[in-house]
Amino acid sequence: MKNKLLLTTAIAGLTAITGFAHAETKLSGNMEQTFKASSIDSGDSGRGLGTEMNIGLSSSKDLDNGLKASYGFNLEFDADSSDSTNDVYFMTLSSGNISFSVARDNGQNLSSTVVPHISDQAGTVVDGESFGNVSTADAHNYDHVRLDAKAMGGTLTLRYAPDASNTYAGDSAIVDSGQSNSEIIYSGNLGVDGLAVQAGYSKLKANGSSNEDIKYDKYGIAYNFGQFAAGADIRREDSGTVASKVEKEAVRYGVTFAANDNLSFGLSYQETEKKTAGVKSANDEETILVGVGYNFGGLGIDLNYAQVDNLGHTANKDAEFFQIRTIQKF
């Protein structure tokens, strides 16, 4: 009877410890599978399957000095690679509405958009798009330090990446390439329910006197009317060399309709213009994206169809893309 009591006490203690550990540490993951087909005038056409798997571990703890510490990382596995990549990590100290982080590929960023859409943006669905979702000057993707402040119904972020060449796992001995990256972003609703606003500016310092600094700014606004949502944004990027500066500007509009809790439809239009050494391209790139998304509970599936005129600003180079994506979270 005594041994049974000791065993019961031990099991109860182990259960309590295990429950505490689970409350503090979180394990998450997902698997994304994509089929894409393309048809490009005067170019390559094809189809293929791709898979991406992610496993993440995160934890948080209240410190003795009153601050809260949060930390975690994510391992990405791709179908065409035998190795995993630690492309995401963060260590955050926070107090009230202010937090400080050392991180990579973490926190709010300028590759996201407030413009309503279904699943992937056009820059992901369309291969070879002139102005993709992510600018080279997006400091979010590099090892960086970051200050976040909750204000004005949203979050204000100040970010600095001392070395833009460091985007994967490295050590403290990594050599600085001389390309530092600084960024400021606000996203939130300004205290208005249904409103979404995004504004940001990023600058990547040029490497060498013959190159231009890469400057990127983005402004977007959207409103959710219930079942309907609509929005627009504008993106601009200056890059290239001093002798041949490249300027791009993309204006995008999008609407979505939620038929019910599981089924949604989306439509977006984007027009991109390009200047090289001050001379505007004769052909603006135009993209129409139509999307449908359905949530089966443990499985999400979306279909996107994109039609592009003057792909890459090349006259009469029109293209069509069709993508099916499934994502399972665990």
Give the residues covered by each predicted segment:
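Outer-membrane beta-barrel proteins
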Residues: 1-330
